[in-house]
Amino acid sequence: MLKIERDQLAAQLASLNHLLQSLPANDYLGRLGFEARRDALQQQLGALAGAEERRAHIALYFGGDPVVGSVGVQAAFGTNVIGTFQDLLSKVWGALDGATLPQMGPIKDKEASQLHITTIVHGSFGFLLEELEDQTEPMFQTPLSQAADQVANYIASFAGENDASFSQIIDILNPRVFQAIRDFFGYIHKGKATFRLVEGERDQEFDHLAVERAWNRAEASNVAEERIHVVGRLLGVIPMKRRFELESDETGTVIEGRVGEKFGSTYLERISTQQFAGKRWRALLHKRTVTKVGREPTDNYTLLELEELPQ
């Protein structure tokens, strides 16, 4: 993992420079040896400076009650946390680029999202998880690496002090991804553990306060999705903004939201110009309900299908 390698080399270089400064002026042989080692480290660092990490590499270090120094971690804790982290990564990977993640059941091609434990890392105790499926060097960042970036961002947003960042993230989370994040922090919180996450150029530590904050947010929040049919009057469609308004026959309330990708721009123009508005339709809507800490649930709607009814 490039960041860990660079950090380790930088630490060795700093230690070596300190030794060189402390050497007696007449210790010529010692100085030659240390300078040769220093030059080699600088060369290694220079080679890594321009390197780009395109595959998924994640290091998870643990502290707190389940960990015995840098010697070991409780087996049940380690198994559960690594398992839920992999589950979270697989679900984020399954929803990349707007792909549909089913509400339940297996994730398509899930095996392609699996990481491998390649190394036990020390400095507390942890694991290095790496993408190993394709041994040829990719030209671009792999989808699994993109998913790892998102996972790290979600974890940081749940545990961070910025409420606005958390609020923005939960507004877009798939319910299964949300549940996986809740499970991950649930095991960390229950185990009275702390952790450090290294992914890409991100290196972030999560103390007991951060874990408690993330767990409280996950417990007090919820994300639910369902498809519903609504019969009512189409009040209007704004093609440029892809927005709609529909008055429900049953409740009399006006439902507004986003028009789904199924509806092309030409079709939306027809709806807005050919007196489709005011007519009765049977609409299939995607309803998303988000519950946040200390707030009333909010509903968001996406129009999926329209079926014209006899007027």
Enumerate the predicted regions with their spans.
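A structural detector for beta-sheet-dominated domains
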Residues: 63, 118, 130, 198, ...
